[in-house]
Structure formats: C-alpha cells, structure tokens
C-alpha cells in the first residue's frame, strides 16, 4: 500500500514544473513591454531636443555626476535585495530577482522626470528674467540626452557580447557536478524505497507464516471445542437421568400418600373404638392420661425441633466459615498470581512474539478451569440434593404433626358432646358403677395403655417413615390382625359391661360434677398449651420457609453460574476468533503508531526549533527597534539642520532676487552667479530623492514587521483555539462550580482592587509623561538621520540595479535547462512504478478475496454451532418448566443483584464527590495563587494551604484592626455586634486549630482510603461485568419498581444536600470574609467523615447487607403462580431468540465495519503521506512565488514613495512612534502569553500522558498477571501430581529390578563356575603350547638358514597363500620347500612334518580361545546389566531430592510473593526498579546453573568460552621422554580438570566397584604430585642382528599408588564446543599427547554420545541433499528455510527427517543383528539418533534467539546472514568429520579387521542407526574380569636355544612390514572399547587416568599368534618396500622381545586384580584392584 505515494509525487512535480514555466514566460513578456515603453520615452526627448547643438562647459562634470548616481543606485538596490533575502528565511536558493531590468529602467525614468519637472518650474517662475539661461539649459539637456542614448546603446551591445561570451564560457563542470549530486540523491531515495519494499515483502511473508500457524492452532482449538461439546452432551444426559430419578421420587411420594390414606382409615377405625370405650365410665380418666401423654409428646417434639434448629445454625456457621475460607484462599491465590505475573514481566519483554501463542494457551486453560468449575458445581448439586431430601423429610414430619393436632381438636369437640350425653346416662347408672368399680378399673387401664402405645408407634412411624418404608406393610398387617382380635374382645366385654353400666350411673353423678369442674380447668390449660404450640409451629414454619428460600437462592445461584459458564465458553470461542482478527489489525496499528510517534516527535522537534527561532526573531526585532529609535533621533537632528539651512537659503534667494530685479540688464554678464544658484537647486533635489528613499525603506520595514506580527498572532490564535476547544467542556464545568466562589472573592478583593487602581493610575500618568518626552526626542533624531542617509545612499542604488539584471538573465536560462532534464528523468520512472504498483495491487486483491472467503466459512460454522446450542437450550427450558416452583425464587436473586448494582453506583458517587472536593480545593488554591498542578499530590496541596493560612495570619490581624477603627464611631449603636463578633472569632480560631490537627491526623487515613478505593474500583469493574450478564436475565418490571424506590431515596438525599447547601450559603452571607474559608474547610471535613463511614460500611460482610435487604422485602409479594412463571419463561425464550438473531446481524456488521475501517485507515495513511509531500512541494512553489511577489511589491512601493513629499515624513514619524509603543506592549504580552500557554500545554500533556500510561498499563498488567498466575498454580499442582506418580512408578520399577538383579547374580555365579572349569583346561593347553613353542623356535632358526636360498621362489606362490589361512600358508610353504629342496637337504622334510603337527595343535588352542571369549562376553553382559541398574537407582534418588528441593523452593517463593503483594500498591515504582536489578542477577545465575540437559552445574566450573590456548606444542617428539605433569599442567590451563577419588564405600562386598565422590580442584595434579614420574621408552637406535638380548633392558613406567584413581574431566562449555565442532577445540582434541590418551579413562556413555552426534551430522547432510534435489525449480533459500524449520521445531521430527529416513530404509528394519555383522550394506534403522529434543540439545539458530530478544525488524537480514554462516559451519563440520575418520583410519592402518573391530566401521553402523536390542549383544571390555581365576601362577623363564633361534628369525625379517604388527595391536584395543555403547548420554566427560605398566596376558598370546600368522602375508603383499629396513627391524625385534619377556617373566597373577583399558584398548595399571562407578558432585 506504500507505492501509491510515489506515482502521485512525481505527477505533482511535473505539474509544478509546468506552472513555474508558465509563470516565467508571463514575467518575460511583461519585462519586454516595459522596456519598449522606456525606449519610447528616450526617443521622444531626442526628437524634440535634437536640434539644439550648443554645448555647455560643464558637460563632462554632469556626465561624471550621472555615472556616480547610477553606481550609487545600483549599490543601494543590492543592499535592499540582500536584506530582503535575509528576512525571507533563506528560501531563495534557485530563484533570483527576475525583474531587475525593469527596476533599473523605471529608476532612470523617474530620476529624469523629476529633473525635468524641476527645471520647468524654474522656467515658469523666471520666464521674463531668465530666458537666456533656459536656452542654455535646454542645450545642455539635449546634449545629455543624446549622450545617455548613446551610452545605453553601447551598454546593450556590451550586454549582448557578454551573454554570448557567457554562453560560450559557462562552467560545464559546476553544472555537471550539481546534476550528479542530484542524481545521486535521487538514486539514494530510490534505493531507500526499494529497501522498504523488500522489508515489506519480508514482513508479508512473516505474516503469512504466522497466519498459517494461527490457522493450525485454531484447528486444534476447534477440535478441543468439539470435545467440550461432547462433555456438554454428557452433562445433558446426566440431567435426563436426574429427571428420571426425580420422577421415581414422585412415584415414591404417591405411594407414601396411599399409605397415609390407609393409615387414616385405620385410625378412623380406632377412633370408632375409642368412641365406644369413651361411652363408658372411665372415659374421663383416659382423657387425663391422653392429655399428659400429648404434653410429653409435644415436649419431645419441641426438643427435637430445638436440636434440629441448632444443627441448622451449625450448618449456617460452617457455610459462612467455608465461604470465608474460600475468599481467603482466592485472595491468596490472587496475590500469588500477581507476584508471579510480575516476575514474568521480564520474560514477556523478551518474548513479544510468543504473546499470541500464550493468549491462545490462556484461553485453553480458562476452558479447563471452567470445566473444573462445572465439575465442582455438579458436586455441589449432589450436596444440595441430599439437603433437599432432608428438608422434605422435615416437611413431612411437620405435616404429620399438624394433622395429629387437628385430629386431637376434633376429638376434644366430640368428647365434649359425649360428656353432655353421658351426664344423663351416668345419673341413671351411678349405683351400678359403684358396684363394678373394683372389677372394671384394671381392665380399662390395660386397654388405655395399649391404645397409648399404639399412638406412640404411629407418631414414631410418622417421624421415621423413610427408614421404615419397607417394613410398613408387614407392621400394618400385624396391626390389622391385632385390631380385629381386640375388637372382638371389646365387643364381648361391652355386652357384659352394658349391664353393669346401668348400675354405675347413679354412683357417678356426684363424681361427674367434680370432674366437670376439673375439666374446665384442664380445658383452659389445654387451650394455653395449644396456643403456645401453634405459635411455635408458626415460628418453625417461618424458619423452614427461610431455609427453603436460602436453598432456592443457592440453587438459583448455581444454575446461574452454570449458565454463566456456558455463556463464557461461547464468549471465549468468539473471543478467540476476534483475537485472531485483532492480532493482524494490532500488528498494523503498532507499526502505524510507531510511525506516528516518530512523526509527532519530529513535529515536536520542529515546533521547539520554531519557537526558539521566534524567540530569536523577537530579540532581533527588539534590537532593530532600538536601532531604529537611535536612527530616528539622528534623522530628526538632521531634519532640523536642513530646515535651518533652507531658511537661510531662502533669505539669500530673496536678497538675490531683489538684486536681479535691479540688475536685469547685467544678468548676461553675471552667468556665473546664476550657475551657483542652479547648483543650489540641484542639491535640494538630491536631498528630496534621498528622503523619499529613506521613507520607502521605513515603510518596507514597517510592513515586514506587521507581517511577522500578523503571523505570530495567527499562530497564537490557532493554538488558543485548539486549547479552547479542548478545554471548553472543562471550563464550562468550572465556571458553573466556581461562580459562587468568585462572587465571594470579588467582595473580598474590592478594597484591594481600588487601592491598586489608584496606584496604577499615578504610575500610568508618570509613564505617559515620560513617554511623550521620549517621542519628541526620537522625532528629532529620526529627521536628522534621514537626511544623512539620503545623502550617503544615492550612488549605490544605480550600481546595484545594473548588476541584478545580469544575474536574473543567467539564472533563468540555467533553471530552464535543469527543469527539462528532470522532467525527462521523472517520466520514465513514473511509468515503471505504475506498472509495479498495479501488479502488486492485483496480488493483494486476490489474497484478500481468499481470506474473506475463509472468514465467511468460519462464521457460517459458528452460526451452525450456535443453532445447535440454542436447540439444546430450548430443550432444557422445556424440561425446566416442571421445576417452575423452584424458579419462582429467582426474583429474589435478581433483587439482590440490583441492590449490589445500586451499592456500586453509590460507591462511585461517593468517589466522584471526593474528586470534586479535591478539585474545589485546587480551585481555591488557584484563586489564592498556590501551585496545584496535576502532578502534585493531595497531601502537598493541603500542606501549602496550611502554610498560606499561617502566612496570612498577620494580614488577618491588620484587617481586624482596621475594622475596629472603622466601627469606633458606632460603638454605642453596635456594642452588641462587637460582642458577638469577638465570640465568633474566638470560636473560629479554636475550630481552625482543631481542624488543622484533624487534617494532619486524617491525611494518613486519606492515603489509606485512597489505596482501598483503588482496590474497590478494581472490584467494581469486575462486578460491573457480572452485572451486565445478570441484567439480561432479570425481569424489567421488578427492576422498575426497585429503581423507583431507589430514585426516591436519591431525591431525598439530594434534597437534604440542597438544604444543607442553602444553610451553608446563609451562614456564609451572615459571616465575614475571614470566616468563609473556615466554613469551607469544615464542610470538606464533614463530607470526608461521611465518606469514611461509607467505606467502613463497605468493608462489612455482604451477607449481613443481604439479610437486611431481605428483611425489608415482602416475601409474600414474590410468590407467584406457576402458570404465570411458565408464560414469562416462554416470553424470555422468544426474547432470547430475538437477541441472538440481532447479535448475528451485529456480528456481520462488525466484521464488515472492521474490514472497511482497516481499508480506510490504510487509505488515510496513504493520503496523509501524499498530502505531506504535496505540502512540501507547494511550500517550495509558494516560497518562490512569494519572493517574486515581494520583489514586485517592493519595486512598486519604491516608485510610489519617490513621488511623496517631505512633509509626510513628520506624520509618519509620529505614527511610527505610537506603533512602536503598541508593538512593544503587544510583543511583551504575546511573549508572556505564549510562554504561559506553552508551559500549561506541556504540563497538561505530560500529566495526562503519565496518568493514561500508568492506568492503562497497570490495568492490563494486573489482568494478565492474574490470569497467568491462576494457570501457573494449576500447572504446578499438575506437576506435583505427576511427580508423585512418577515416584511411585520408579519405586515399583526399583523393586522389579532388585528381583531381576538377584536372579542375574545367581546366573552369574553359575557362569563363573563354568569359567573356572574352562580356565583349568586352558592352563593345561597353555603348558603344552609352551613346550611346542620351544620346539617351534628351534625349527624356525633352521628354517631361517634355508629361507635365504629360496626367496625368489616364494614370490611365485603369493596368490595361493592369500586364499588360505595363516596356518595353511605355513604348511603350503613348507611343502613347496620340501618338493624343491630334496637335492640339497633332506632335513627339510622332518621340519615340515613338525610344523604340521604344531599347526594342528594351534587350531585346537584357537578353538578353546574362542569359547573363552564367548564366556567373557556373557560375563560382561551381566556386569553391564548390574551397572545399569545401579545407575538407575542413583538417578531415582537424585530425582527425588531434586523434586523435594523444588517443593521447598516453591513454598519459599509463595511466602515471598505474599509479602510483595502487600507492598505493591504503595511502592510500585520502587519494586519495579528492584525487579529490573534482580532480573540481571537472575539471568547471570541461570546461565551458570543450567547445563545442557537441565542439570545443575557446579559454580567452580569455569565458563570462559572464547579464550583458547594451544594445549601442546606441535613439535613434541614421541622419541624424547616427557614428564606427565607437564601435560597435566597444560590440560589444566585449557579447560580440563584433574580429579581424585577421595571417598570409597568399601562395605559393598558383592561387586568389585567403587562408589564414591570426586575431589576436583584447579591444580590438583601438581599439588598432590599424583604423576610422579613417567619415562617414555627412549629412542631406539639401529640394533644389529647380533644384539639379541637388548630388548630385555627396555625402560618401564613407574607404577602409581594402588589406591589412587586419577580422572580427567572436560568442562561442560567445552563439550558444547565439541558438539558444534569448534575449530580451536578440535585442534586441542587432536593435539593431546598419546601418552595422555593411554592413561585416560573415557566412560562408555560419552563415547556413545559422540558417535551419535557425528552420525546426526551425516544424516543432516543427506537430508539437505535430498531436499535440494526434490526442489529443483525453487530457490536454495527456501530449501534452507525448511532445514532451519526442522531445527526450530524438533518435536515434529517425524514430518521431516524421520519420514525421509523411513522411506529410504523401511525394508532394513527386518534385518537381524547377525546380518549386520556379515555385510556392511545391511544395516538397521533406529530413532535414537534423532531424539534430540529441545531439552537435551537446543539446536536453535542465531536468528531465532535474536527474535526472542525483539529484533523483529532485522529478522530477514539476520536470517540471510545466519544462513551463510550455517552453510559455512556445515562445510566445516563435514571437513571435520573427514578429519575424525582420517584419524580413525590412521589408527586402523594396516590392520586385519575381524567382525566389528574397526572404529570407522562402527561409525558407519551408528550413521544409519543404533538398535536398542544390540545392547544385549555388545561387550564391555572395560569391565572384563579376565583375572578372576585364583589358581594361575607365573611361569618362570626358559632360557632355551629355541628362544635364541626365534629371536634370530625375527631379526632377519624384512623390516618394511613390522609397523603392521604395532598397528594391529593398537587397533584391537580401540575396537574392543568402541564396540561398548550405552544408551544414556552423560553431560560431563570423565577420562580415567591410570598407569600403563604391563600388558594383558591374553593379548600377548593373540599378538604372537597374529604375528606368526601374518609374516608371510606381509612379505607377499608388500615385496617392494625396502626403505628404513634397519629401523623397522629393530622396532619389531623390540616389540617381540617385550612379548617374550612378558611371557617368561611378567605373566599376570590370575589371583590378582581386574584390568581397565584405555581408548587404545591397552591395559591401564593392573595394580588397580577395582573398577569404579562414577558418582560425582555434578549430578
């Protein structure tokens, strides 16, 4: 979008060029017309005056004067032009004064016109007297005119010649240089634009890549959303299940109701029985018993109710406590989250690019948190369901009690009726009852007891019906049977007793009367109990209703929370997509804002520079004014002198005229006198001219000054308008607030103003007088200066006019040529840029169409999802209609939310009031002239007010004294007023003191409250967000009712406030000025107290407030029928659907608006750039035009000024003086005003920006921190759980491994037994072998004598010998010798037979050796498994410790974070500085403490990475003896460390391994003298064949202490360098001396790790080649980008490199390990090589690291540069791999490879992969236990002649091939070590140092065998190598002698110690009796 700017720029340049050309053409035409007019004037003069031929004597003098005048005029014009150019701010670089020719001609014309006019005037006055003189003058004029014409013609000719010469001789060099400079400038701009285009393209590529990543992440989010929807479906299914359960509960209730009906029927039967029984005599006694029992049951029920109430209260308290605990935990979590977020701000500053990824992760975490909340809500719902069951149980109990109570009342009524009937019957049967009394009492009491027991059972059943539901049927059946039996018995008894009752009636009549009295009493008591019981039941019902309401509230809250969470989920899904759209817009906005900020900074700089320039100009103007004032004084003096001279001359003229009248006849004789007079007239004309010029100059200065002032005024007006527009609203508010105060202050300050006016009037009068005096003096000086200047500057004007004409013509021509060339260049560029721009626009449009389609598709998917969710929610609403009676209580919740909203509004109002009163204080300070900027804190303002009050106490006393003086005359009338005033004043002083103290004490409280207000504001914001959600669900009608009530409260509060304000105003009017301030302070204090009370109330628990509100609300008004609720819910559903449809339409509109706004923003930015360029161009054009216009105006004004008279000068001087005064005053005012405005503007800008930045940044940071801390806490908890699981798994694995270990030990013991048996057989074979070897040596000596005769014949049979084995070669050669040596010697046959016997015997020995090797391999396998298990145990223990340390560290950080959060609000700025300091330290420690694999490194390890020194001198010779301590010293200096084992755990008896610690130090080897001596074998000279026994005298190395184990450690930083194959490190690695290598112990893990890394590089090389071949048509940069992308995301290896390897090597996975050994091509693929994750090997490029450090703008350049560097490094790596392989080849040179004994072959194996199964088959020669047998003994030396013959045989061999034997030995050592690999790589390389004293016994046997087997082969392969024969033979003899001496004398003790091998597979110090397991400080 940037290219639109360029095309328009060039079009505008072309248009401006055309305009400039047209303007110049018009000006040329005007100049030509003016010239023609001037020429016509001269021609007329010549025609009229050409006839006069008389000459005047003074023609020459006149000519000279004229020339001088012309020169002066030219000089003056030059000076004027220079002054004009300086005033125009140096903008005339290419355009000069184009109209100078016209000026010159006009000046000449004007001069001559004036001259002719003056002459004509003199002639008119002197027609009669001076006719002769006029004739002479006419002659002189004509002659002068002719000369002038001639001069002009000559001048024109000369000008033409000059033009021709200049055209020829123009300096082409200057012109070309200028053109080149401009071309270079244009090229630079073009290059800059191209660079910008490239940067834009690069950014577009980066943006596209990021969009791809974002799209991928969105897909992942969509998948997770699907999972979330599935969870929601499951939740709905569970709701369905819940509904089914509820239906079952309803069915159970129905069954219970049926049972209750049955119970009622049975109760009715019982009641019938009771009626029959009550009809008998003892009914009264039964009633008494019933009453007592019922009282007891009531008491028991009351007790139960009380207990349950206590339980409910306890539950309430527990709920409250749990809520408090939850709040505390939430606060703590928030505080912790805040602190952790602050710690993460440092990382976020370095990871701006990852912010978008983190946002998406946060959204995912929020989803997870929401799911957790949903789960918690489900749990709470389960609890609530349980409580519902309990409440239902209690309700059933209460219902049963009510029913029983009603029944009892009915029974009482029946009893009363029956009593009345019985009275009549009892009177009859009293007599009968008396007789039967004794018999019937016992029976009746039994029946009564049975009935009471049944009633108790029924009550108990009603209480515990749920527990006994299953047993009800059985009990009921039993009860029915019992009742039937009882009824039968009762009927029989009734029949018997009816007869007896008749007798008892009479007896009981008397008793009935007494009983009736008692019954009345009991009825009263019963009624009392009844009323109390009813009241208690009502209270219980009320409490139950309250609990039900609370329960419904809780249930509604949970349902609302669920709905909220669902809405939040949908909102988050929408926010994710909106965030993705906003990300792209924000990126563009960031770039645009950065550009705008830069522009604004530049504009600020320009404005500051302009302001400084204006200040300088103002100072210059002041200086110029002073200078002009001085000039005016001088000119006034000159004018006075001229006037005096003119008066004198006039007097003289009068005298002369009188003389001329008298002497007219003598005039012709007195010509000389007349000439003097004419001369005087000429001087006067000159003076007039000078005066006119000075006047013109003064006017020009005045006009320029006016223009500058006008510009300044315009600038000031513009700024004032801007400030007024910004501050209009604020000013209007302040006006309304402060009008009352201003009126009061006016009344206070009227006296002061009057006094000041009087003082100012006096001063003004004095200043006026002084100023008038100065003006008069200035006038006089000005007139004098004008006269002097006119005389000086006449001649200069003419010369300057001529010079300017030449310059103008030359500049025109040059300018035209330049413009033509530039137009041609710009047209070509414009065409090219148009084409490019159109292509790019087409590309952008195509890309935008694709993006728009994607957005539309996404939106359609979202709409479908919303539809699905809506359908689901509709189903939910349909189901929830059944539970409408529960939802009726939602209204209460809505009311609570509204109350909370109103509380928030109230709090906001109080905060607004607080701010208003602070503003009032500030306004008072402004009125009192106290500084109160926004930066100043409230405390400082109050302190300044106190200081002001203290300073003004003296003034108050003075005012009081004056008032007492004024009122002294009215003491009689106003004595009472004085008394009241004194009392009021005393009270005011006391109140002031009190208020001052209160203010000081309350300042601190205000600060604390401000802090709390900030916290409350944050809470209020959160609550507002929640309120918006609740509002959608609330009913409008109820809200309106409550709003009205609250509006009434507000109106009342406002009325109260108004009343108070009216009272305050009345008090203010009554009191005096001094008391008004005190009243204001009081009011402020009162309202501050109110504010504090409000804050204190806000601190209280919201639960109490809610309870108070609930008490006020009528609960009965909230109960509404279920049908109404259903209708309203349906209406809400319809409204909700409409809102959703609206929201969809709004979404479409918003997306369209966002797209349109982005396009408009881009277009506006382009337009802005275009307008800026147009303004720049127009400014240049306008400047040129202004210059031309100014020049034209100046010239016109000069012409007009010449025609004016001297009389106007005086008037102008007066006007100028007045204007100067005005301007001085105006300038002073403008300067002060501008300074004030600038200061205010700057202060307000700074304050606003500071506040905005602080508030916005703090809010954003705090929100982001809170979210991050929540996520981190969850992540930490998950980590804890994972670690615990891992620990448990590790423990289980450890137990399994222990079991396996025990099994392996058993197997190992069995193998050891077998090994001992084999070793015994081996001893026997070795003894036989030695005997045979002695005989063989004798035969060899004989064979050597014969060999010299048959050397030539042996060469013919080389090919045959190659095909067969070593032993067969010996047999064949012997046979060939036998066949051809029969003639010479018969002894050869016997020798051959013996050799064949020896060969057969040796074959048996080799077979035994192979079995021994196989057994050793099995032993090594077992030992490897054991060592791996121990290492795993150690690693588990270390991990446990590490986890415990992390837990402790987290606890400490939590405590520290809590402390930090407390201090955050008060000391945020200090904490931020401390954090910046701590971040540096933490960064440094983090680098030192972290290794490659995340392990903690030791602080003692040095980290100097770039300082290298050579490790050894390259010219060290192996032949000279060197001391090992020197090598160690060099190693210590070059990043190596020597160590010593200082602790050994010798208690472990099961294995021969050391478990201990390393002690390491800087110069450990030198301090302890560990390496005492080392004598390298001295130089071996040429030894003759006769010196056989010299080999026995070879020097051996001195042994070390047996207990010392030296270890060589390489530092971690050096390992990293080795991994990246640093040149210097590789050189160090190669220069290590072999003697050091031989004593070095390298752990197998490190060797395996190095080989893995080398193979990784090989695979990467193959991968690059394959990718490059596949992408033939694309750039190599893109290919490299893919390779770099592999490094950056190592987790996606399967997509890149593994996929490549699997495609090529898929068939090789089926090949077994044995096939690998047979063929080199068949190799196995594994994945271990490629599993270098970011935690283990961070293969990040330099560019990626720089991106993390926010070098986004330079990313492309760094990528290109890093690409080249990585290619270079890659080539170096390849070359270094070759070096390593060459080293391996040198070691393997001339060695016969068996199976996998070659290092280069092992590299090839690793290069394709390493199979984990191969580890079972790999041997570990380092841990070989070759010396386990204890029965071996040393064999003594055998000094037999056979040995001598063998030595002679070896000495006579060809020395060319002896090096092969040494290389063979070395190669075997290397192969045995390199084949031992381990899966786990170790961070630190430990190189084990041990002594090399004696070789291994088995190896020496193998050497001898290989030596004898390969002698003929060596001779046959290299027949032509005969150089250095003697040296090699001696070397070979020496090696053989060493072997022989070892066999004879140094045979190892098999009861001795284990052997340890170095990298060359040589045995290191057999005196070491134990292997070692390294357990170092580094782990």
Swiss-Prot record:
Q: Which UniProt keywords apply?
A: Coiled coil, Host cell membrane, Host membrane, Membrane, Merozoite
User: Could you tell me where the Low complexity compositional bias lies?
Assistant: 68-114
Task: Write out the biased-composition intervals (Basic and acidic residues).
Answer: 13-24, 31-42
**Which residue stretches belong to region Disordered?**
1-42, 54-116
Which branch of life, at top level? Eukaryota
The record, for InterPro entries, names:
VID_Regulator (IPR052884)
Practical use of this protein? Answer: Possible candidate for an effective malaria vaccine as determined by epitope response in sera.
SUPFAM superfamilies annotated for this entry?
A: Myosin rod fragments
Give the stretches traversing the membrane.
none
Q: Which stretches are tagged as biased composition: Basic residues? A: 1-12
**Coiled-coil regions listed in the entry:** 127-366, 412-666, 693-876, 992-1094, 1126-1307, 1398-1467
Q: Name one GO cellular component term.
A: host cell plasma membrane
- Where is this protein found? Host cell membrane
The protein here is known as: Repetitive organellar protein
The lineage is: Eukaryota, Sar, Alveolata, Apicomplexa, Aconoidasida
